[in-house]
Amino acid sequence: MGSIDAAVLGSEKKSNPGKATILALGKAFPHQLVMQEYLVDGYFKTTKCDDPELKQKLTRLCKTTTVKTRYVVMSEEILKKYPELAIEGGSTVTQRLDICNDAVTEMAVEASRACIKNWGRSISDITHVVYVSSSEARLPGGDLYLAKGLGLSPDTHRVLLYFVGCSGGVAGLRVAKDIAENNPGSRVLLATSETTIIGFKPPSVDRPYDLVGVALFGDGAGAMIIGSDPDPICEKPLFELHTAIQNFLPETEKTIDGRLTEQGINFKLSRELPQIIEDNVENFCKKLIGKAGLAHKNYNQMFWAVHPGGPAILNRIEKRLNLSPEKLSPSRRALMDYGNASSNSIVYVLEYMLEESKKVRNMNEEENEWGLILAFGPGVTFEGIIARNLDV
């Protein structure tokens, strides 16, 4: 894409004709709220594990994640019905998918309804659906069950993104942006939904990396409505979406590795991931900002909606880009309140971004109109979108 029109760079914050905008946000969570301080004892009791070294390691990890609360689908009722999920080595993929397929649909429908309510228009005005999940596997896919659950028209066009991991929310937003800008009058529902049950396992000395996921990841769903040329009577755009790019790093595909096995998904997260992101994030951001015609902008003159993959990743990004501490506050808050919720997290970050931008406006401080929406996932893949905050 070319540089941003000079008129758009002025002080008047109206959406640019033909540009995709985020018109509403919504979220949903399962009923089980987990306090991080009680997680270790509960997890080891549930899985009947008494290994003191593993318990000490998980205790240390829980203290370093900065997570305070998370929501999870897993419950005593589920384990009572499927006790094999907490036993090492059993073939449980069928049971897991039965639980996950239903759970992600339920959460996606709830988040979408909340989003549509915030949007204020009729559900019949939705023309396209982009559905993202790394927590289910079935034919037909969750996109159809979401459309069915919402009562969408059979004519609704659907796109399905499976197993995109933590970059899925921004990848879905990029796809929704392209749909909205190439189909005048369209309104795209982007829904993301994730649950960790697909990879829930008892602790094992053979899989020490599993404990990182136990300490960090959470469940939930997110939703957005995306469309261009908002109706000034009934729509209030939140963010305008400009340049969007994707980049994968060659020879890093084993850094975030997931395999669907008889025991569910086995994840391996390399310790090198934070360093890999730190080493490559600046060049990626320069490329993104340059394509948008904003190379003159200082990083601290922009907002940063970054997927909260973990505190180490956020700390390294902050250090490498020399960002002021408040720049990643929305990401850190999302991590603290919801954990790393994979593709959903960017919705939660954007909600906090809007909340904090309103506080800045009320305090008569400098507003950051332009910014970046970033996420990192398997590949290692970088996703980035230049956005304009229209709500400040």
Curated annotation (Swiss-Prot):
Recorded hits in CDD domains, A to Z, give: CHS_like
Please state the pathway this protein functions in, per its UniProt record.
Answer: Secondary metabolite biosynthesis; flavonoid biosynthesis
Catalytic residue positions: 166
The record, for Pfam families, names:
Chal_sti_synt_C, Chal_sti_synt_N
Please list the residues that bind substrate: 218-219
Q: Which residues bind CoA?
A: 57-64, 269, 309-312
Which InterPro entries has this protein been placed in? Chalcone/stilbene_synt_C, Chalcone/stilbene_synt_N, Polyketide_synthase_type-III, Thiolase-like
Instruction: Describe the disruption phenotype.
Output: Pollen exine layer defects. Reduced accumulation of flavonoid precursors and flavonoids in developing anthers. Plants lacking both PKS-A and PKS-B are completely male sterile, with no apparent exine, thus leading to pollen grain collapse under vacuum. Altered pollen-stigma adhesion.
Function of the molecule? Plant type III polyketide synthases (PKSs) that catalyzes the condensation of malonyl-CoA units with various CoA ester starter molecules to generate a diverse array of natural products including long-chain alkyl alpha-pyrones. Accepts up to C(20) chain-length fatty acyl CoAs as starter substrates, and carries out sequential condensations with malonyl-CoA to produce triketide and tetraketide alpha-pyrones, potential sporopollenin precursors. Favorite substrates for are midchain- and v-hydroxylated fatty acyl-CoAs (e.g. 12-hydroxyoctadecanoyl-CoA and 16-hydroxyhexadecanoyl-CoA).
In alphabetical order, the GO MF annotations are: tetraketide alpha-pyrone synthase activity
Q: In which tissues is it expressed?
A: Expressed in flowers and flower buds (at protein level). Mostly confined to anther tapetal cells.
- Might you give the EC number(s) for this enzyme? 2.3.1.-
Q: Where is the signal peptide?
A: none
* Localisation per UniProt entry: Endoplasmic reticulum
Look up what happens after changing residue 227 to E: In lap5-1; pollen exine layer defects leading to altered pollen-stigma adhesion
Q: Report what the protein is called.
A: Type III polyketide synthase B
**GO cellular component, as recorded:** endoplasmic reticulum
